[in-house]
Structure formats: structure tokens, C-alpha cells
């Protein structure tokens, strides 16, 4: 879909099974989602899974997006997962794999009316490569990740000039380094207290006004560890934010 000015009507859910589950189960679970008034889903893709059986991978993925759209649910596919980031994937030797994967996935889905936007990477900073580094080494590694994100966003845009692009950042504080590469910026929020959660939204509103781009929260709520559903969704409502 073309970028919207406002994503506050998005009511989404992360769907880790996604295109991998049987069609009968998929239709049943999407029906549950619609009964809860949910209208979008975010799914994790895998380049290495694609590489094993490209044709089968693309067939299942396309069928998922079409089935979800028939149920009134748009899809945000995640191309790369930062949680499982392998440092070698940031090097030149991986570029050909990334290029072929992005080309085939984007060409398969770019014409689908149910495609909400491309999420180039989930949580680029949430991995040992970044977390275990300190000081200047951490800055250097983070810039290397950002270089990969910029290249990947550029690859997507060259293949699809219509549909929106985002990056699902771990924290609001990670967003600005690549905000120029996206149409919509997105962040995750698992912070434990209202004050910290509010600060993320205030920072998002300030950045949105400054760069002229909309935003949404593409992951939130984690019972027993962080923000409970009632608190997190209430704050989204107060800040007119889609999730």
C-alpha cells in the first residue's frame, strides 16, 4: 500500500507461524483475529529458509498474504530478523544472497493489495553482536548494521516504488539513524513503567513532526515482564498511535 499520513487505525498482531501453518488452521486463526477487530499482521520471513526451496517459499508466502487479505487483514512481512543476526550477514560475501532474496520476495508481493508495508528488519539492535559490544566498538558495529539497513532499504525501493518501507526498531532511541531510509518509522515498546513508555511516544511525536513522517508501534505488551495490555493500549490511544 502507498504510505499513509496516519496509521492510527492499524490494529495488528505479530504472527510467528504465518505462512508456515496449514491453510485450514490459518483461516481459523485469522477468523479469531477478525473477531477481535484486528486488521493487520506482521510475519517473520527467513532468507535461509527461502534459499532451501525458493519456489515453495514464495508460493506459501503469497498464499498467506492473499488469504489474510480475504479476511480483511493486511500483512507487514519482515525481511530480516535482527534477533538472530549473524555478523557475517553484514559482510560483502552475503550481499548476493540478500540481493536475490529481496528481489524474489519483493517481486512476488509488490502487486498484492494486502501488503501494508515492508519491514526491512526486526529489532536490529537486539542481538549479541550489538549488546555485548562496548564503547567505540559498539558504535562501529551499530553503524555496520545501519549500513546493511540502508543498502537493504535501497534494494527494496528500486524494486517497489509504491509500497511503504519501515524498520521495526527495538527502541525509539534507535530510530533516527535510519529515519531517512523509511516512509514510516516504527519502534517497539516493552518498557515497565508509564513514565518510560510515555517518553517513547513523546520522542516519536517530536521526530514525526520534525521529519514529516508517520509512525506506529509494531510490538508491545509482554505480561509478567513489562507493559500490560491495558496500560500499553491505553497509552497508544492517548497518543493516537497504531499498533
Give the positions of each predicted feature:
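Active-site mouth of glycoside hydrolases
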Residues: 1-182, 191-195, 210-211, 220-228, ...
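Active-site-flanking ligand-binding surface segments in enzyme catalytic domains
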Residues: 201-219
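Substrate-binding surface in catalytic domains of secreted glycosidases
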Residues: 193-203
